UniProtKB/Swiss-Prot annotation:
Disordered as annotated region, ranges: 97-122, 322-357
UniProt name for this protein: Large ribosomal subunit protein uL2m
Keywords: Mitochondrion, Ribonucleoprotein, Ribosomal protein
Keyword Ribonucleoprotein attributed: yes
GO biological process terms held by the UniProt record: mitochondrial translation
Complex and partners: Component of the mitochondrial large ribosomal subunit (mt-LSU). Mature N.crassa 74S mitochondrial ribosomes consist of a small (37S) and a large (54S) subunit. The 37S small subunit contains a 16S ribosomal RNA (16S mt-rRNA) and 32 different proteins. The 54S large subunit contains a 23S rRNA (23S mt-rRNA) and 42 different proteins.
Ranges annotated as biased composition (Basic residues): 106-122, 330-340
PANTHER family, per the entry: LARGE RIBOSOMAL SUBUNIT PROTEIN UL2M (PTHR13691:SF5), RIBOSOMAL PROTEIN L2 (PTHR13691)
NCBIfam families: rplB_bact
Role of this protein: Component of the mitochondrial ribosome (mitoribosome), a dedicated translation machinery responsible for the synthesis of mitochondrial genome-encoded proteins, including at least some of the essential transmembrane subunits of the mitochondrial respiratory chain. The mitoribosomes are attached to the mitochondrial inner membrane and translation products are cotranslationally integrated into the membrane.
One example GO MF annotation: structural constituent of ribosome
Family: Belongs to the universal ribosomal protein uL2 family.
InterPro entries membership: NA-bd_OB-fold, Rib_uL2_dom2, Ribosomal_uL2, Ribosomal_uL2_bac/org-type, Ribosomal_uL2_C, Ribosomal_uL2_dom3, Ribosomal_uL2_RNA-bd_dom, Translation_prot_SH3-like_sf
Amino acid sequence: MLQPQFRPLLAGTASFAQTVLGRTVARCYATKAATQSASSTSTSNTSKDAKAKIVTPYVRDAGMMRTYKPHTPGIRHLKRPINDHLWKGRPYLPLTFPKKGQSKGGRNHSGRVTVRHRGGGHKRRIRMVDFERWIPGPHTVLRIEYDPGRSAHIALVKEEATGRKSYIVAADGMRAGDVVQSYRSGLPQDLLDSMGGVVDPGILAARTCWRGNCLPVSMIPVGTQIYCVGSRPDGKAVFCRSAGTYATIISKEEETREDGTKVMTGKFVNVRLQSGEIRRVSKDACATVGIASNIMHHYRQLGKAGRSRWLNIRPTVRGLAMNANDHPHGGGRGKSKGNRHPVSPWGTPAKGGYKTRRKSNVNKWVVTPRVRNMGVRRNKKTT
């Protein structure tokens, strides 16, 4: 049996682990208020200075990777994020359907290969994830599940009013028992009554902008990290859906009234993606507060080629090693591609392509494009 070894990524020692892991942290995720008992708040502080309180750091299982003793060569370099909170059983079958047919091998309806290096993986069931979240009201998180079709984890939520279940992309830190809501269809009447009929942006943000809640972008304060961001008022989430991704709201078109309250006057909100690109999205587009779950996904190491095959990933063969009828670099005796510049399998130059694109082909929704090729590539908006 594999014996896991826990190695914190933080540069800590045994004393640091005893200090951090030995304490209990009161969890408060999403919109569920956590009650802390008096016994848990009373700590055994023997310091003479009673006013000096030690702040307990936030401990996350996702901040560690799991390694194994190398009983076999395939697990010597294997590293996995520690996600012991995931559901161990099968998915909710009414929200899934099997993936089968030629599409699993990267083929289209006519049988031609449209996506290379795919095929032969483990059988899967596609999870139908709700990226729109139009249904209002509180939803209870039943469990956090692994989804083979995406890098982020998904959460099975149940609507408290009707008992309807659905899948959503889980936020980092979301756990079973949390309560999330969607305010995309409008504010509920009980929330307006509790605020006295006056909608103050600051109080409204404090009542609604909690982790896992879906809101229009105009209701989220500047500087908030969001994921599953939409671009159109009636569209679904299209940005920041992978594991560990998020966007940041950087500016709005607002004006300040005489009483000090801010009112949004423009139609768009500027958000900054992790690539550095700043985009304009509609103020009524959807966004979820938080960061997409499974933030340690990019630190994983598969350890062997067989795990890539399990994940439906086929080998990538060099064009130089192919035959002449399979690739422009193929053929010849030995490693010889001739005196030709490197090209793709379809003959397009591999380093830059054909420089025939018009400068007028500019995306009007991009305010500041991302830096490409370490700043060497020219910007179409400035040239």
